[in-house]
């Protein structure tokens, strides 16, 4: 057993080191010094995380590990209580990987670069803190910590309509946070003279069914905004349409996954009876979301908004996996979270680098881009294939596991399972339609651009490096998905056996 506070260091390091970014001395190119300082912090964080997980984490142990507990607020029983298990280790590693690459991708940012990189590191701490929290108050504070950086990144470095998008984002997420705070307060104050928000204590707490449903619904609204789940998704296309692509990488790769993680970590683990009641509705909403978002994506002229709606559609598979209440379905949902974290981040990165070169976002104005930009065309096509679940890539395995999870669920009758499976199949057909249509309208044809030197228009070493770094795990998970599933399978079995299979 390790007594070193690994998780505290991992959570606090990015924002602490980011705070000193305003005092970093530099000579010559200020932006280059700040960018590489931030990248070094991210790399150090990844090394510490990898070391702690490799040498102090037992993957076959479903219990909470590396847990720490420090008295935080003495009046109440509130603690700084981080801890990890098989559910949280994957998202934490994903956070470090995507944040590092997003920092590397942010080289074109030159205005207020100190503040920009500090906000990215602050988001890093907030996201890792959310995934490693074992106290509801700590979870809520970390959940809120990453909202303000996103708002500032969007409002200061976004597009022409950035203020509208930033305001819409903060109104939606702040509204969801009110419901989250109400749920946290209600669970902490219920049935005890001394309030407690410890996950382990709350897991053994029983509530009247009506009250448990109220708690569940409050948390669900907060997660529905963040994930997003229809009809609370409308902030996402506007945000992705205006945000800088490094911010989009963090949104699509990490922030959207926090809602699904919270749905499993809090709603499934702490409110099992309410989840059993709500799970059919999650499956229904997930099925509708797959079709609705895929159909809406096909009608988008803005190619960044088209990718954003594809993220909403893929979230539907995660909802179905969570609602299936099976080992297979829940493991598939977790795999989909990791898989789409890579794929979504890569697509927005390539969309941003394409926009930097041609300064066009509407598909009907594009065409023939494959001729001057063959490298970007190749990478964009590869990740589009991953998004439409091409066999051999991570998206295919994740959707297939979710599919098997719902058809093997003992909770649902045969006819509902057939209908849901049919809807999922339609979604799998619609995804290639909007993905391949986007590729055709962007890259094929004979339009010519007034660019004096096509060589400089194509992808450079930075774009190739970032794309390859993301593509390798996409293919690796597609070929050997047990690399991810082995982390979560024991914890998933423990959750379902403790709460649903008694």
From Swiss-Prot:
GO terms for biological process: ATP synthesis coupled electron transport; electron transport coupled proton transport. InterPro entries: NADH_Q_OxRdtase_chain4 (IPR022997), NADH_Q_OxRdtase_chainM/4 (IPR010227), NADH_UbQ_OxRdtase (IPR003918), ND/Mrp_TM (IPR001750). It catalyses: a plastoquinone + NADH + (n+1) H(+)(in) = a plastoquinol + NAD(+) + n H(+)(out); a plastoquinone + NADPH + (n+1) H(+)(in) = a plastoquinol + NADP(+) + n H(+)(out). One of its GO terms (cellular component) is chloroplast thylakoid membrane. One of its GO terms (molecular function) is NADH dehydrogenase (ubiquinone) activity. The keyword Thylakoid applies. It is a multi-pass membrane protein. It comes from the Eukaryota. The chain crosses the membrane at residues 4-24, 37-57, 86-106, 113-131, 136-156, 169-189, 210-230, 244-264, 274-294, 307-327, 332-352, 388-408, 418-438, 464-484. It is found in: Plastid, Chloroplast thylakoid membrane. Coiled coil: none annotated. It holds the Pfam family Proton_antipo_M. It is an enzyme of class 7 (translocase). Keywords: Chloroplast, Membrane, NAD, NADP, Plastid, Plastoquinone, Quinone, Thylakoid, Translocase, Transmembrane, Transmembrane helix. Its EC number is 7.1.1.-. HAMAP family: NDH1_NuoM. Belongs to the complex I subunit 4 family. This is NAD(P)H-quinone oxidoreductase chain 4, chloroplastic. It comes from Calycanthus floridus var. glaucus (Eastern sweetshrub). The gene is ndhD.
């Amino acid at each position: 057993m390790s007594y070193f506070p690994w998780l505290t260091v991992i959570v606090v390091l990015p924002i602490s080191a980011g705070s000193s970014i305003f005092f970093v001395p530099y000579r010559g190119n200020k932006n280059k010094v700040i960018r590489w300082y931030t990248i070094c912090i991210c790399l150090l964080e990844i090394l510490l995380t990898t070391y702690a997980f490799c040498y102090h984490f037992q993957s076959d142990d479903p219990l909470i590990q590396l847990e720490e507990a420090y008295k935080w607020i003495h009046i109440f029983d509130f603690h700084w209580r981080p801890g990890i298990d098989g559910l949280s280790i994957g998202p934490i590693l994903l956070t470090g990987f995507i944040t590092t690459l997003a920092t590397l991708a942010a080289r074109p940012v030159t205005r207020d670069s100190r503040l920009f990189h500090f906000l990215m590191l602050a988001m890093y701490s907030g996201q890792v803190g959310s995934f490693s929290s074992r106290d509801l108050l700590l979870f809520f504070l970390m959940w809120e910590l990453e909202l303000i950086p996103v708002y500032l990144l969007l409002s200061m470095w976004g597009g022409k309509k950035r203020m509208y998008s930033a305001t819409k984002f903060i109104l939606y997420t702040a509204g969801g946070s009110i419901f989250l705070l109400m749920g946290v307060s209600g669970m902490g104050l219920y049935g005890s003279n001394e309030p407690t928000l410890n996950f382990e204590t709350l897991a053994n707490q029983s509530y009247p069914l009506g009250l448990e449903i109220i708690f569940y619904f409050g948390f669900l609204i907060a997660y529905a905004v963040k994930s997003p789940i229809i009809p609370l998704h409308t902030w996402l296309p506007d945000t992705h349409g205006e945000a800088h692509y490094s911010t989009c990488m963090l949104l699509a790769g990490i922030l959207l996954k926090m809602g699904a993680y919270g749905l499993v970590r809090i709603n499934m683990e702490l409110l099992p009876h309410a989840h059993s009641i709500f799970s059919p509705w999650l499956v229904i909403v997930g099925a509708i979301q797959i079709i609705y978002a895929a159909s809406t994506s096909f009608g988008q002229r803005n190619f960044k908004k088209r990718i954003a709606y594809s993220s909403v559609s893929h979230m539907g598979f995660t909802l179905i996996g969570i609602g299936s209440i099976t080992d297979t379905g829940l493991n598939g949902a977790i795999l989909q979270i990791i898989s789409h974290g890579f794929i979504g981040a890569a697509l927005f990165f390539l969309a941003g680098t394409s926009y930097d070169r041609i300064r066009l976002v509407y598909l009907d104005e594009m065409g023939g881009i494959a001729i001057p930009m063959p490298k970007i065309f190749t990478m964009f096509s590869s990740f589009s294939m991953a998004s439409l679940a091409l066999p051999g890539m991570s998206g295919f395995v994740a959707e297939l596991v979710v599919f098997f999870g719902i058809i093997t669920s003992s909770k649902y009758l045969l006819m509902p399972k057939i209908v849901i499976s049919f809807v999922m199949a339609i979604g799998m057909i619609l995804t290639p339609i909007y993905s391949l249509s986007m590729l055709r309208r962007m890259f094929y044809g004979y339009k010519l651009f007034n660019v004096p030197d096509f060589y400089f228009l194509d992808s450079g070493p930075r774009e190739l490096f970032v794309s390859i770094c993301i593509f390798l795990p996409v293919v690796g998970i597609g070929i050997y998905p047990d690399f991810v599933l082995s982390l979560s399978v024991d914890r998933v079995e423990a959750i379902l056996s403790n709460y649903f299979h008694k």
